[in-house]
Curated annotation (Swiss-Prot):
This is Citrate synthase. Pathway: Carbohydrate metabolism; tricarboxylic acid cycle; isocitrate from oxaloacetate: step 1/2. Belongs to the citrate synthase family. Pfam families: Citrate_synt. It comes from Rickettsia africae (strain ESF-5). GO terms for cellular component: cytoplasm. Citrate synthase is found in nearly all cells capable of oxidative metabolism.
Amino acid sequence: MTDENNNDSEFAELKIRGKIFKLPILKASIGEDVIDISRVSAEADCFTYDPGFMSTASCQSTITYIDGDKGILRHRGYDIKDLAEKSDFLEVAYLLIYGELPSGEQYNNFTKQVAHHSLVNERLHYLFQTFCSSSHPMAIMLAAVGSLSAFYPDLLNFKEADYELTAIRMIAKIPTIAAMSYKYSIGQPFIYPDNSLDFTENFLHMMFATPCTKYTVNPIIKNALNKIFILHADHEQNASTSTVRIAGSSGANPFACISTGIASLWGPAHGGANEAVINMLKEIGSSEYIPKYIAKAKDKNDPFRLMGFGHRVYKNYDPRAAVLKETCKEVLKELGQLDNNPLLQIAIELEAIALKDEYFIERKLYPNVDFYSGIIYKAMGIPSQMFTVLFVIARTVGWMAQWKEMHEDPEQKISRPRQLYTGYVHREYKGIRER
């Protein structure tokens, strides 16, 4: 409860076994304030219980702000819609890492450094050959990114002076590894980066060019992918970002930390949701079957889930989904699919029906960022097993910004959550013949 005797509301009171503890209230620059419970365990001989950390702030951060009730997402104070419409991915990367938008000179230097570091060690090619041809690109990504620590042993004992170069290396090399993982999975030769192309063009070129076929990047496709990368760049302390921070708190090298983020992102409840949306739309098959599947989604005994709706944080329309809905239409119009893409037609009608249904309104289930992104990827010719890989490219920027911020935080400690133990109190060991 709030301390009514404190006019500035700087403390909360917690009563445990008859004893009152005053807990400092930490003021946020915007959004919810936070009660500091860090001394409760030492003074009250008990811990707090918060499964999934849904009510716990694990750190202080200046990078990303989310207001889920109002549908607000901001990076360093800038609205996500403004960044998606007016900026480009590397400018947003600079913003997340350094805290400010770059000047023209800073932007040019940054993009040149990213281009310079886009090549990977030639020996990495041998690692790809150890995977079978049916290997999931995310499995290859996970191994390849982790292996980078073998090629940069100087970063096993990194220093503060290494933070910025490490971030640039990671942002530069991840798209190259992503494209290599795709090429290997389809049996095509690797395509080297082309420093004459910008970041997004370069990735598309590495994905779709071949040694005997030149690939010309469609500007509408490039702009759409640029927006997708911006919209996925960071999202506060989600599962994968928290995983990167936890791994980083132990002093693990940055390549190992990003590998843990990739592993977490691979989960279908996190980075794999847009692929699940595509599978759901295919299962529905036609607009006439939407009411049937709406009913299945409402039936608690039916295993069917309406993918692409609802979010752990947003209780309003996901601002990223609003941008992607329009982007999806732009891409399909450019490709001549706007009026004849069955997945888009099902998605639009499904959204319209769900937003008018009291069941979804009461539960605040609105379309999220995954609802339209998969349709865009599919129209671009990107296979579903690559969807999460593209998420990795974008989110690496956020992971590195969060990793850098964590190491620069003077309050940084190794992460060590506690538990509520509910197992046996004590048991006597018996030999195997006595059991």
